[in-house]
UniProtKB/Swiss-Prot annotation:
Superkingdom as given in the UniProt entry: Eukaryota
Alphabetized Gene3D superfamilies for the sequence: Diaminopimelate Epimerase, Chain A, domain 1
Name of the protein: Proline racemase B
Gene: PA45-B
Keywords per UniProt: Cytoplasm, Isomerase
Assigned EC number: 5.1.1.4
Active site: C91, C261
Organismal lineage: Eukaryota, Discoba, Euglenozoa, Kinetoplastea, Metakinetoplastina
Entry function: Catalyzes the interconversion of L- and D-proline.
């Protein structure tokens, strides 16, 4: 048996959503920032993503990330996110997993008697400032982790999208929380958020994302490479009394987020804040389709003079952005050495999804 390549990974989940983090075995990936590394992987080495994410090593709802040395000043780790359909500029649940793994596996050293360990991630969407909160009396056991996300904002409000029957005309908000989201109430689609309705939610989410990218142009005003709606966030009434809403996010190749979605939580908080429905410092609890929870807060707001998006009323006053924090719990499930045999007919993975 002769192996073409081997990769080492940490297999984790954050509030139920998979996070397979590749820690070593990659060749040199060119790029002067994480966005360029992401683009290089996509254009030249996408077989790696497929082999790691898809069957038989992964599954149709797999998620993961590549770790790199950081490039941006002040960062501890570089990271590029991936799923079964491609790559994302940012991911909240996988950032929480990476922060947790960095501390619990010794990737980063932990100061003596520390209770909170800062971990700064260099992502394609910008710097994400994480904190691993340690269990009392331990040196590296993480009770949960928080991330301060990249600036988030409501981009466009009450966008009318026409879908095939039985959905018809649907109104959505478009917001950015590290990725662009189309945010839609479940009642507008006529579907309750439940595991039993998952296939219908996936179908509606994929239809909506396809149509919104066909009919609506989005462009991050400061990051030229971010110009598509990557995720559809369907929300409704919470089941858990602690939560404000329940949601499911559809992304990738009809993937459904098992966690409450970190970047989606930021996008939702930015939307609520812009509408006057959430205050700075107020706790916002978001529930997933599984019933797991993220805790979020808006930490502050800022106006960027001269920069505008469709909801900006006064270009001189500028675009409103908010700083958001998300907290959740990630678990290490195992350490994985992946072997790639050149004679394997499924070397680079496969999917049975159409």
């Amino acid at each position: 048996m002769r192996f073409k390549k081997s990769l080492t990974c940490i297999d984790m989940h954050t509030e139920g959503e998979a996070a397979r983090i590749v820690t070593s075995g990659l060749p040199h990936i060119p790029g002067s920032n994480m966005a360029e590394k992401k683009a290089y992987l996509q254009e030249n080495m996408d077989y790696l993503r497929r082999g790691i994410m898809l069957e038989p090593r992964g599954h149709d709802d797999m998620f993961g990330a590549f770790l790199f040395d950081p490039i941006e000043e002040g960062a501890d780790l570089g990271i590029v996110f991936m799923d079964t359909g491609g790559y994302l500029n940012m991911c909240g649940h996988n950032s929480i997993a990476a922060v947790t793994a960095a501390v619990e596996t010794g990737i980063l050293s932990v100061p003596a008697k520390a209770t909170n360990v800062p971990v700064v991630l260099d992502t394609p969407a910008g710097l994400v400032r994480g904190t691993a909160h340690l269990q009392s009396g331990t040196e590296s056991e993480v009770s949960n982790a928080s991330i301060i996300n990249v600036p988030s904002f409501l981009y466009q409000q009450d966008v009318v999208i026409v879908l095939p029957k039985p959905y018809g005309e649907v109104r959505v908000d478009i917001a950015f929380g590290g990725n662009f989201f189309a945010i839609v109430p479940a009642e507008h689609l006529g579907i309750d958020i439940s595991v039993q309705n998952l296939s219908r939610l996936q179908e509606a989410g994929e239809l909506l994302r396809t149509e919104i990218n066909r009919s609506v142009k989005v462009q991050h005003p400061q990051l030229p490479h971010i110009n598509t709606v990557d995720c559809v966030e369907i929300y409704g009434n919470a089941t858990n009394p602690e939560a404000k809403y329940k949601n499911v996010v559809i992304f990738g190749n009809r993937q459904a987020d098992r966690s409450p979605c970190g970047t989606g939580t930021s996008a939702k908080m930015a939307t609520l804040y812009a509408k006057g429905q959430l205050r700075i410092g107020e706790t916002f609890v978001y529930e997933s389709i599984l019933g797991s929870l993220f805790q979020g807060r808006v930490l502050g707001e800022e106006r960027i003079p001269g920069v505008k998006v469709p909801v900006t009323k006064d270009a001189e006053e500028g675009m409103l952005v908010v700083t958001t924090e998300i907290t959740g719990k990630a678990f290490i499930m195992g350490f994985n050495t992946m072997l790639f045999d050149p004679t394997d007919p499924f070397l680079n993975g496969f999917t049975l999804k159409r």
